[in-house]
Amino acid sequence: MRLTASAIAEQFGLTVVGDGTTEVSGVATLAHAGAGQLSFLSNPRYRPQLADTQAAVVVLRADDADAAKGTALVAKDPYTAFAKIAALFDVAPVREPGIHASAVIDPTAQVSPGAHVGPFVSIGARSRVGDGCVIGTGSIIGEDCVVDEGSELLARVTLVTRVRLGKRVRIHPGAVIGADGFGLAMDAGHWIKVPQLGGVVIGDDCEIGANTCIDRGALEDTVLEEDVRVDNLVQIAHNCRIGAHSAIAGCTGIAGSAKIGRYCLLGGHVGVVGHLEICDKVVITGKSVVRNSIHEPGEYSSGTPLTDNRTWRKNAARFKQLDVLARRILAVGKEKE
């Protein structure tokens, strides 16, 4: 597919600087783009690459347009504009409707004639797969699940039981949705299992990364509202609620019954203690541990910044002495009084 700069600008409301007839057939980074490819400049640190890039068209802000040596497309947010343009060239393989001969489907399950069910798929009792859905190779849909219109389970996705997916949900390989929550009670020195009788509800337009686990609720459902984006290797425990338009980076763990607001961003390897609440529009930076509820929007951190090992060891040794030092300072203050 080849598109002119003018056609792209018209489709996405951008401004052309230079030759609008310039054609592009793909996308790439500034450093590696070649003839006929489109790139973008969003981070100022890459501005020096404008002078050397071979990109036919660059998406950038108005104040960077003078530095572009070829055709430019001016956008208020170049990264978002690039994402929309790149989607034009991201041509997914066509999945024809139909059920592969190796699939095993319970007689009580309902599969739309417009759905694609791949090899070695299993669909359990009373589950429903909507129109335009793609159920990839080796995926398992357990009992009483719903996969709504246009949703896609890539290879080896497991919906254990009582999982309801909204429209246009995309789940990447290896994810497990609806497994038992980690509910245990101690009885006479032995653990007994607390039955997990709830389910999982995932709203429209959500995306779940590879090997992520979302447990079903004990009594009430675990809920992800619409347009939540979850990276790979994330654990969301039972009874959690994640607000709409929030994004969670890889290796994050969210303990049971935590409630996270709308438009929140959780960096990589964040830990969230259970039974707390985070309000809307909160950013938690990577490696932080959230131990208390957050009631004010803003950016929060508790991770330890990287430093050289020798300095870190000195700081760690001093950290263990903080209580002694604090007592000494307090004592000196009292002596001066």
Curated annotation (Swiss-Prot):
Enzyme type, top EC level: transferase
GO cellular component terms given for this protein: membrane
Similarity comment: family membership: Belongs to the transferase hexapeptide repeat family. LpxD subfamily.
A GO MF label: N-acyltransferase activity
Pfam hit, one: LpxD
Domain of life: Bacteria
TM region(s), chain numbering: none
GO BP terms: lipid A biosynthetic process
Function: Catalyzes the N-acylation of UDP-3-O-acylglucosamine using 3-hydroxyacyl-ACP as the acyl donor. Is involved in the biosynthesis of lipid A, a phosphorylated glycolipid that anchors the lipopolysaccharide to the outer membrane of the cell.
Entries under CDD domains matching the protein: LbH_LpxD (cd03352)
EC nos: 2.3.1.191
Organism, as annotated: Xanthomonas euvesicatoria pv. vesicatoria (strain 85-10) (Xanthomonas campestris pv. vesicatoria)
Recorded catalytic activity of this chain's protein: a UDP-3-O-[(3R)-3-hydroxyacyl]-alpha-D-glucosamine + a (3R)-hydroxyacyl-[ACP] = a UDP-2-N,3-O-bis[(3R)-3-hydroxyacyl]-alpha-D-glucosamine + holo-[ACP] + H(+)
Record keywords, A-Z: Acyltransferase, Lipid A biosynthesis, Lipid biosynthesis, Lipid metabolism, Repeat, Transferase
Protein name (database record): UDP-3-O-acylglucosamine N-acyltransferase
Subunit structure as annotated in this protein's UniProt entry: Homotrimer.
Pathway: Bacterial outer membrane biogenesis; LPS lipid A biosynthesis
Active site: 238 (proton acceptor)
